[in-house]
Amino acid sequence: MLEVIKAIEAEQVRSDLPEFNVGDTVKVHQKIKEGTRERVQVFEGTVLKRQNGGARETFTVRRVAYNVAVEKTFPVNSPLIEKIQVVRKGKVRRAKLYYLRDRVGKAAKVKERI
């Protein structure tokens, strides 16, 4: 039974997405359906965490705009995600960057990996 589940999950995993890690700044192009219209909305921010693996993998992106912080969690293998662009690579030493929630301004900045 377990082999059947793993085989089904392996079919659903996307391979067209770039490699990105926690601390990277990414642009997520997400399809939004409003009535009969469909458009693409771009959400840019820092990746706070990546959870699980395989077909159920998710990642959370945080951005601060006009002094309001917004965190969105996206499923990696969702068909609603059109593409993910890595804007810059971040240098971090943690798997979950929850400490960024308490920081404001330049203190919330992640160093760039060269």
From Swiss-Prot:
Keyword Ribosomal protein carried by entry: yes
UniProt KW Nucleotide-binding keyword: no
Stored InterPro entries: Ribosomal_bL19 (IPR001857), Ribosomal_bL19_CS (IPR018257), Ribosomal_bL19_sf (IPR038657), Translation_prot_SH3-like_sf (IPR008991)
Cystine pairings recorded for this chain: none
One term under GO cellular component: cytosolic large ribosomal subunit
GO BP terms in the entry: translation
Keywords: Ribonucleoprotein, Ribosomal protein
PROSITE patterns: RIBOSOMAL_L19 (PS01015)
An example Gene Ontology molecular-function term: structural constituent of ribosome
Pfam families given in the database record: Ribosomal_L19
Family: Belongs to the bacterial ribosomal protein bL19 family.
Known function: This protein is located at the 30S-50S ribosomal subunit interface and may play a role in the structure and function of the aminoacyl-tRNA binding site.
Protein name: Large ribosomal subunit protein bL19
The organism of origin for this protein: Clostridium botulinum (strain Hall / ATCC 3502 / NCTC 13319 / Type A)
